Amino acid sequence: MENRNRNSRPIKNQDPVNEFIRAHQVLVIDEDKQNLGVMSKRQALEIAKSKNLDLYQVGVQPDGTVITRIVNFGKLKYEQQKKSKEAKKHQTKIENKEIRITVNIGKHDLETKARKAKEFLEEGSRVKVSLKFRGREVVYLDLGQQTLNNFFELVSDVGKMEKEAKLNGKFLDMYIVPKKN
């Protein structure tokens, strides 16, 4: 477009446009998707400016030829942003929640933590249950495994185990996801 600031530089992760295309020879495709052939970048820019549009680098062919399109770059970017927003709307975001327990947790405390985990699972969140070993408690790995199994039995009506319990440093971690209805 003519009203573009000539001193502005494109953002690094952005595709090259107009003068910022580095190739000397480019393959040009016009706004009607007609192949205009290989020509110099200067000629392609003149064609784009005569139509009051931008020269946009689409990609590079295996032989090294740069592929460009004559488009309204502002409109193209707007449509890309619109598509990405629409795609984001339709994504289901699963939130991760963590519940920490210890090997020698009391029965009532375990039930309270399980009730909280059920709430998280009903909201649709993924729950990470971390059993922390303190000091030399790591040698009682089977006791920790039993505690996690007891915890899972309390929440098994609303969740299913995604990953089995796995030792990670001083933590025994288990992941529970909501059951599909």
From Swiss-Prot:
<keyword id="KW-0396">Initiation factor</keyword>
<dbReference type="GO" id="GO:0032790">
    <property type="term" value="P:ribosome disassembly"/>
</dbReference>
<comment type="function">
    <text>IF-3 binds to the 30S ribosomal subunit and shifts the equilibrium between 70S ribosomes and their 50S and 30S subunits in favor of the free subunits, thus enhancing the availability of 30S subunits on which protein synthesis initiation begins.</text>
</comment>
<dbReference type="InterPro" id="IPR001288">
    <property type="entry name" value="Translation_initiation_fac_3"/>
</dbReference>
<keyword id="KW-0648">Protein biosynthesis</keyword>
<dbReference type="InterPro" id="IPR019815">
    <property type="entry name" value="Translation_initiation_fac_3_C"/>
</dbReference>
<comment type="similarity">
    <text>Belongs to the IF-3 family.</text>
</comment>
<dbReference type="GO" id="GO:0043022">
    <property type="term" value="F:ribosome binding"/>
</dbReference>
<keyword id="KW-0963">Cytoplasm</keyword>
<dbReference type="Pfam" id="PF05198">
    <property type="entry name" value="IF3_N"/>
</dbReference>
<dbReference type="InterPro" id="IPR019813">
    <property type="entry name" value="Translation_initiation_fac3_CS"/>
</dbReference>
<dbReference type="GO" id="GO:0003743">
    <property type="term" value="F:translation initiation factor activity"/>
</dbReference>
<protein>
    <recommendedName>
        <fullName>Translation initiation factor IF-3</fullName>
    </recommendedName>
</protein>
<dbReference type="InterPro" id="IPR036788">
    <property type="entry name" value="T_IF-3_C_sf"/>
</dbReference>
<dbReference type="Pfam" id="PF00707">
    <property type="entry name" value="IF3_C"/>
</dbReference>
<dbReference type="InterPro" id="IPR019814">
    <property type="entry name" value="Translation_initiation_fac_3_N"/>
</dbReference>
<dbReference type="GO" id="GO:0016020">
    <property type="term" value="C:membrane"/>
</dbReference>
<dbReference type="InterPro" id="IPR036787">
    <property type="entry name" value="T_IF-3_N_sf"/>
</dbReference>
<dbReference type="GO" id="GO:0005829">
    <property type="term" value="C:cytosol"/>
</dbReference>
<comment type="subunit">
    <text>Monomer.</text>
</comment>
